[in-house]
Amino acid sequence: MNKQELENRQKKIRNFSIIAHIDHGKSTLADRILEKTGALTAREMKEQTLDAMDLERERGITIKLNAVKLNYTAKDGEEYILHLIDTPGHVDFTYEVSRSLAACEGAILVVDAAQGIEAQTLANVYLALDNDLEIIPVINKIDLPSADVERVRQEIEDVIGLDASDAVPTSAKAGIGIEEILEQIVELVPPPTGDPSEPLQALIFDSYYDAYRGVVASIRIVNGSVKVGDKVQMMATGKTFEVTDLGVSTPKPISVKELNVGDVGTLSASIKTVGDVRVGDTITLAKNPATSQLPGYRKMNPMVYCGLYPIDAAKYNDLREALEKLQLSDAALEFEPETSQALGFGFRCGFLGMLHMEIIQERIEREFNIDLITTAPSVIYHVTTTSGEVIHVDNPSKMPEQQKVDSIEEPYVKAAVMTPNDYVGAIMELCQKKRGTFIDMQYIDTTRVKITYEIPLSEIVYDFFDQLKSSTKGYASLDYELIGYRQSRLVKMDILLNNEVVDALSFIVHRDFAYERGKVIVEKLKALIPRMQFEVPVQAAVGTKIVARSTIKALRKNVLAKCYGGDISRKRKLLEKQKEGKKRMKMVGSVEVPQEAFMSVLSMDEE
């Protein structure tokens, strides 16, 4: 194409993404847009076309971002190229959202006409504003009997401060208002700014592993252009590759010869190792490289750590491969090998949050067929020792001994909960129970409140979200962000079975709750660990002090069965002999800990 054609084509490109809270109808709206632009025939349409993973369809949530190229003929008779980048809405996947937004110029903000603005909506809007995107508000689900479009309009104006007077009322399910949205995209979203004659700069916003083509990168061209056969260079790692294939998704993948400014597509260059393609890196040409990198994404730091161990020890290498492949498309997953006396060899993995952790586990079990044992999730603590050294502890078993610890700091988050005002009491009680500090409370309208607390992250990671949902009948929504580390009175609690510490059951707890937690866990383990031929003491200890104990009674054979009414000394002889045997057994016996026991350490708050 000559320069003029390229410039005209560039003016016709619109890159946008859809942002919304979970369940506000983002994926359904994406389906309707695909249908309206004729990307898919009615026969090929299925619910949530862009959610390709089985897990996404089952849970009805979007996990991975997706990019699609659509052709749309607008009312002015011109044909436009729209790139729709679908994003997840759940708090754990904010980094997926921030990656999508970096590749766009506009965003459609979907708000549920019945529920109004939720915590996640706000968080995503702020992300979009940080990226200077044009935001188009859309009020979805107007066909619901409880929909109140005017109230939601007012809310968008009051809470976010966007002008919502021309927000499009739509129903993605019934297909109402889709055309107006497309017209608004063409009108309001600016075309990509970029210079086709400059050296190539392309932003990698996602990558995945394909068994045949190696690593495939999803890219957005910012300046210049790239053709099949070009030698390209990754700017972060400095490695060079030859482009073997370029493609666009219309949801069906189609190969193209070149990608130009503003295009969103995929690039494969027979890249074999996962580490060579970093999400957020810039691709440029090896011959005439760009001078600077594009402002990429910030590196996402894991918030939650837990150990993953294969139940079958022989599958250790398979687990490593599985994690490497998942890490490809999931920039936020981190892992390193670790060993545990109780569980053998495995990995310490870092995740963004509990949903992220659950999904990775489920994907490993499904896609790679590996059965896992998981240990209790923990966060990173900063421990200052008496000698003045600061250690970062992501695993309770790495905690130094009590007498060597001077102080421990734990991460705190600022949690914003949006809720109907009937549940304010229940939420405040829950946050107080989780060691939260009350910061602020705002009424959004007459029925809804935003409550802000500062809470230790370790209290949120396990079941805070579930408890929040159950204490508000599912109406509350949560968003949280890290605010830094603070000193806390924390201790490490060890669990001893048969007087030996089981490293995988250790956890870190606030000193005030140590006694209660110890008691609950000891009772739980007593119920879960199968009885042995000898009695097993179960103890919870803080340092050298035992704070709770329970005993799993021994199974015993009835040795007196064949003594009919016999002599007491005969019975005593048999019982003494049995007692001797049990004593010997206890010295050499080892205790098997079932998987449920590890999980029970997690779910102790439910009692």
From Swiss-Prot:
PROSITE patterns: G_TR_1, G_TR_2. GTP binds at D23, H24, G25, K26, S27, T28, N140, K141, I142, D143. Keywords: Cell membrane, GTP-binding, Hydrolase, Membrane, Nucleotide-binding, Protein biosynthesis. It catalyses: GTP + H2O = GDP + phosphate + H(+). The keyword 4Fe-4S does not apply. SUPFAM superfamilies: EF-G C-terminal domain-like, P-loop containing nucleoside triphosphate hydrolases, Translation proteins. The keyword Glycoprotein does not apply. One of its GO terms (biological process) is positive regulation of translation. It is a peripheral membrane protein. Pfam families: EFG_C (PF00679), GTP_EFTU (PF00009), GTP_EFTU_D2 (PF03144), LepA_C (PF06421). GO terms for molecular function: GTP binding; GTPase activity; ribosome binding; translation elongation factor activity. Coiled coil: none annotated. Its EC number is 3.6.5.n1. Its main location: membrane. One of its GO terms (cellular component) is plasma membrane. NCBIfam families: lepA, small_GTP. Belongs to the TRAFAC class translation factor GTPase superfamily. Classic translation factor GTPase family. LepA subfamily. This is Elongation factor 4. It comes from Exiguobacterium sp. (strain ATCC BAA-1283 / AT1b). The gene is lepA.
